[in-house]
């Protein structure tokens, strides 16, 4: 096994909350998958949830070496949690095709947040 890609991103929660306040649900829909939107709509701390997903997806796109560009969109990534609460990152669309071309067999995601910031790191492994 070898590391094929590494990406990290940090998001200021207040900045995401302000954008959400200005643009509302359309802003969230631009970032979140359908499954993530279903959970988002039930939460009280929507800005924090959105900031963590934003950081995770940015980190994943950086690990691919593209950023959110070259056909890779936020919707190419879905973040969920396993039965123990560990974050799980699923790739689809262009991101999935790029990962397959790179020889990615394992995707690792870590997300942390505190009062002001959410941070995520993604490792793509063969």
UniProtKB/Swiss-Prot annotation:
Biological processes, Gene Ontology terms: fatty acid biosynthetic process
Enzyme Commission code(s) on record: 2.7.8.7
Transmembrane segments: none
Cited Pfam families: ACPS (PF01648)
Gene3D superfamilies cross-referenced by the UniProt entry: 4'-phosphopantetheinyl transferase domain (3.90.470.20)
Reactions listed under catalytic activity: apo-[ACP] + CoA = holo-[ACP] + adenosine 3',5'-bisphosphate + H(+)
Any one GO molecular function term: holo-[acyl-carrier-protein] synthase activity
Essential cofactor(s): Mg(2+)
UniProt entry keywords in alphabetical sequence: Cytoplasm, Fatty acid biosynthesis, Fatty acid metabolism, Lipid biosynthesis, Lipid metabolism, Magnesium, Metal-binding, Transferase
Keyword Electron transport listed: no
InterPro entries: 4-PPantetheinyl_Trfase_dom, 4-PPantetheinyl_Trfase_dom_sf, ACPS, Ppantetheine-prot_Trfase_dom
A Gene Ontology cellular-component term: cytoplasm
Domain of life per record: Bacteria
Subcellular compartments: Cytoplasm
Lipid biosynthesis listed as a keyword: yes
Binding positions (Mg(2+)): 9, 58
Protein family per UniProt: Belongs to the P-Pant transferase superfamily. AcpS family.
Function: Transfers the 4'-phosphopantetheine moiety from coenzyme A to a Ser of acyl-carrier-protein.
HAMAP family linked: AcpS
Name under which the protein is recorded: Holo-[acyl-carrier-protein] synthase
């Amino acid at each position: 096994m070898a590391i094929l890609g590494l990406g990290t991103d940090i998001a200021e929660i207040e900045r995401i909350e302000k954008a959400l306040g200005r643009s509302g649900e359309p802003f969230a829909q631009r970032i979140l998958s359908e499954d993530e939107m279903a959970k988002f709509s039930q939460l009280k701390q929507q800005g924090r949830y959105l900031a963590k997903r934003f950081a995770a997806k940015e980190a994943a796109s950086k690990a691919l070496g593209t950023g959110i560009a070259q056909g890779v969109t936020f919707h190419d990534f879905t973040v969920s949690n396993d039965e123990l609460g560990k974050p799980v990152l699923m790739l689809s669309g262009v991101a999935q095709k790029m990962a397959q071309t790179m020889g990615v067999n394992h995707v690792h995601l870590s997300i942390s947040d505190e009062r002001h910031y959410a941070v995520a790191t993604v490792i793509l492994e063969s």
